[in-house]
A protein has these predicted regions:
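The feature captures the beta-strand-to-loop junction immediately N-terminal to the Walker
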Residues: 47-49
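ABC ATPase nucleotide-binding domain helices that frame the ATP-binding cleft
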Residues: 55-58, 154
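Helix-to-loop junction immediately C-terminal to a conserved catalytic motif
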Residues: 62
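Conserved coupling/switch loops of ABC nucleotide-binding domains, chiefly the family-specific signature
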Residues: 68-71, 121, 221, 253
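Conserved ABC transporter NBD signature motif
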Residues: 70-78
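ABC ATPase nucleotide-binding domains
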Residues: 82-241
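Non-catalytic connector elements of ABC transporters
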Residues: 249, 259-377
Length: 377
């Protein structure tokens, strides 16, 4: 179970993968013709709301769901007709799926019984797995005698002793408390990097996706909305759905008045603004500015600014609709000439009350333009 002896990570390809369920109202496309390449050794997260198809896609990769149409290949070899137990993959489930009547050691070694390994190798793999997860001292305990975090580590050890090419995670942190979730996501990411595993992680938690992933696949209604590195997904969303799902965003309507290479001059209620945006927009296109709450400084956090113009930050007056203290930050919903915006200030600053007039400054460089008709599902 050392880095040197772990099975080589696998590269996965999905081509026009579709899953159709029969329902009383007719056929339901849970996953609709998705295409995806996952490089060996990468941590990839399927992110989206409930019912978007992320878990169904994971289960098709694992072999727990049949593929209605399309192809899934691992290192160039088709998996479609390969049963789950023959696929070089391990899955960590949301419920951990530990056997209550088996000790930790026997739970970790359960899958190895089907590999018919020599006894000495089996024992060594179990010992390595327990050591890797730091749970050797719990080897003879039963699951009910463990905390949630300890059970999670047992489930991880059980997956890793199989020496998979790919490890699959089906929302494994959702049953843990907030503090333990933070610790476990750091441990899982560090372990994946140490072993060089290919990992596919399913979650609806944007923070998990942003902090753990090499690549994020944002899904909605059975389709892929956007694939990219975390910073790209967050700062350069392709449409309103992605922008809204990743963090807190407001939207300001505008029209493209000039194309300037890879930037646009956009006429908005905030003035004419030079900003970057989704490629391919043209003069006259109706667009929306994506305005992130953390880039909208309120009150004392609004810096001094020269007279507003297309190249400067945006200064505007607003009326506080609602405000809340959230520890390190104050959060605001604001009524402005450009519509409703959300903003932030430092938690040590005064919390402005509803109805107060405040000054806000929006960082122009943080603005991003998307098509006005981009989907919000």
């Amino acid at each position: 179970m050392t880095t040197e002896h772990h099975t080589q990570a696998g590269a996965l390809q999905l081509r026009s993968v579709t899953k159709i369920y029969d329902a009383k109202q007719g056929q339901h496309r849970a996953v609709d013709s998705i295409n995806l390449d996952i490089e060996a050794g990468k941590f990839v997260t399927f992110l989206g709301p409930s019912g978007c198809g992320k878990t169904t896609t994971l289960r098709m990769i694992a072999g727990f769901e049949d593929v209605t149409e399309g192809e899934i290949t691992l290192d160039g070899q088709s998996l479609v007709s390969v049963p789950p137990e023959k696929r070089p993959m391990s899955m960590v489930f949301q419920s951990y799926a530990l056997f209550p009547h088996l000790t930790v050691k026997d739970n970790v070694g359960f899958g190895l019984d089907y590999q018919k390994l020599p006894a000495a190798e089996r024992e060594q793999r179990i010992a390595d797995g327990l050591a890797l997860m730091g749970i050797e001292q719990y080897a003879h305990r039963y699951p009910h005698q463990l905390s949630g975090g300890q059970q999670q580590r047992v489930a991880l050890a059980r997956a890793l002793v199989m020496e998979p090419k790919i490890i699959l995670f089906d929302e494994p942190l959702s049953n843990l408390d907030a503090r333990l979730r933070l610790r476990m996501r750091s441990e899982i990411r560090a372990l994946q990097q140490r072993l060089g595993l290919t990992a596919i992680f399913v979650t609806h938690d944007q923070s998990e996706a942003l902090t753990m992933s090499d690549m994020i696949v944002v899904m909605s209604a059975g389709t892929i909305e956007q694939v990219g590195e975390p910073r790209e997904i967050y700062h350069r969303p392709v449409n309103r759905f992605v922008a809204s799902f990743m963090g807190t965003a407001s939207f300001v309507a505008g029209t493209v008045s000039e194309v300037r290479g890879d930037r646009y001059l956009v006429a908005t209620p905030l003035g004419d603004l030079d900003t970057a945006g989704v490629p391919g927009l043209g003069v006259g296109d109706h667009v929306e500015l994506v305005v992130r709450a953390e880039n909208t400084a309120v009150g004392l956090d609004a810096p001094g600014n020269e007279q507003a113009g297309e190249g400067s930050d945006v200064v505007l007056e607003a009326t506080v609709r609602s405000a809340a203290f959230d520890g390190s930050i104050n959060t605001y919903v604001l009524d402005t000439e450009a519509g409703t915006l959300e903003g932030r200030s430092h938690g040590m600053n005064e919390l402005h009350a509803a109805g107060e007039k405040v000054t806000c400054v929006i960082s122009r460089e943080s603005l991003w333009v998307i098509p006005a008709d981009s989907s919000e599902k």
